[in-house]
Amino acid sequence: METLLVLTNLPDLASAKVMAAQLIERRLAACVNVLSPCQSVYRWQGKVEQAVEIPLAIKTTRPRYAEVESAIRELHPDEVPEIIAIPVTAGLPAYLQWIEQECAAPSEC
């Protein structure tokens, strides 16, 4: 099964913690790293914007990706949230297996 690293950013620590907890509770992710705040600079609707954001690094599997994306869209306050999925091409086999087990649909447990 393919492991994915999904990246998103939240506007504050409180919303980042809520999203991380929801993804774990719903078994959509095995682990969510709530990272240190970062400064983002981007163009939005023709204007250069700057914002302090809280990055999330979400470990999941390809079969759960659509549900992860849906949950992020549901819980994220932005109109167009960053949602980027990066395939994991290598890793400690035991860790990748753990991700697969934790993200298994309840009927597969």
Residue ranges of model-derived segments:
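Positively charged, small/polar-rich N-terminal and surface patches that mediate targeting and assembly
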Residues: 1-109
